[in-house]
Regions:
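Glycine-rich phosphate-binding loop plus the immediately following alpha-helix
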Residues: 36-62, 98-140, 243
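Glycine-rich phosphate-binding/hydrolytic loop that grips phosphoryl groups
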Residues: 225-253
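Glycine-rich phosphate-binding loops at beta-strand->alpha-helix junctions
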Residues: 38, 137-140, 192-216
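Residue-level signature of catalytic and energy-coupling elements of molecular machines
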Residues: 50, 85, 118, 180, ...
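Phosphate/pyrophosphate-binding loops at sites that engage ATP/ADP/AMP, CoA/4′-phosphopantetheine
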Residues: 177, 181-196
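Short beta-alpha connecting loops at secondary-structure transitions
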Residues: 102-103, 116, 161-164, 195, ...
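Gly/Thr-rich phosphate-binding beta-strand-loop-beta motif of the actin/hexokinase/Hsp70
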Residues: 72-103, 118
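Nucleotide/phosphate-binding catalytic cleft detector across ATP-hydrolyzing
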Residues: 1-81, 136-166, 187-190
Length: 253
């Protein structure tokens, strides 16, 4: 494993805890740090790709930290919050308190996990992704007095019950949310998130996913960060307002 970055947590100068020990006098000093690590093979493979393309690497930045800089306010970091980035293949959980990164982990579950599950209804992934975006609902409830809703495949070859589709969506979404909240609990800060939970990422747009997280966590203060805090000027056909480009925007700021 390689250490990619180090986030200082606190220092102890003598018997006193300090956020910044510079300029203080003491007989001894201790420090607590959060090490952000990744498999060595992943980093080397990434560097090799750029070398093969003859592109120089100016710097290596960690995506969750870049995203946090783009979407979190200073007040949220100070008060305590959890940033949950629902991506296609992974879900990242970052916990902040007192302007310090306290916890960071990546789960190997994301929006594509739901899409692949939907393919069990005998369709290709492209079609499954379309249906997920159009009809997917983490808390689907069908009205008793209404006719059962259905959706058609693109080629009109057959129809699928929306309830069958969302049984699959809800099951996988529940697994992802359960794992997210478990990681927040492991951080030890689940009762210190005064600013609540901030959701971002393309997969966070699944209907009622925020309600599922609210029900699991019992935290009412949950917001969706679909755009970065800074102003971005771009053509409407380029700028996506769904949170999927927030890491990219963070690299620009």
């Amino acid at each position: 494993m390689d250490i990619l970055d180090v986030a200082p947590q606190e220092y102890k100068v003598g018997n006193n805890l300090q956020a910044n020990p510079v300029g203080l006098v003491g007989s001894h000093i201790e420090g607590r740090f959060l090490n952000i690590v990744a498999r060595t093979s992943v980093r080397k493979n990434l560097e090799h790709c750029f070398q093969q393309a003859k592109i120089d690497i100016a710097d290596q930045l960690i995506a969750p930290l870049v995203t946090a800089n783009a979407v979190l306010t200073e007040s949220e970091r100070r008060s305590g919050c959890a940033l949950v980035d629902f991506g296609a293949d992974t879900t990242t959980i970052s916990v902040y308190k007192n302007n310090i990164l306290r916890f960071l982990t990546v789960l190997p579950l994301g929006g594509n996990s739901i899409t692949r599950d939907i393919t069990s209804l005998q369709m290709e992934e492209e079609e499954a992704e379309r249906l997920k975006k159009a009809y997917g609902d983490a808390f689907y409830e069908e009205e008793e007095d209404q006719e059962e809703a259905t959706c058609k495949l693109d080629d009109d070859s057959r129809t699928i019950k929306v309830s069958d589709l969302n049984n699959i969506v809800e099951a996988r979404a529940e697994e992802i949310i359960a794992n997210v909240w478990n990681q927040v609990q492991l951080s030890g800060y689940e009762d210190k998130l005064l600013a609540g939970i901030i959701m971002t990422g393309g997969a966070a747009n699944l209907k009622n996913l925020d309600e599922m997280l609210r029900k699991r966590s019992k935290i009412e203060k949950i917001r969706m960060a679909k755009l970065p805090r800074n102003t971005v000027h771009a053509p409407s056909n380029v700028l996506k307002k769904d949170g999927s480009q927030n890491t990219l925007f963070g690299l620009l700021f």
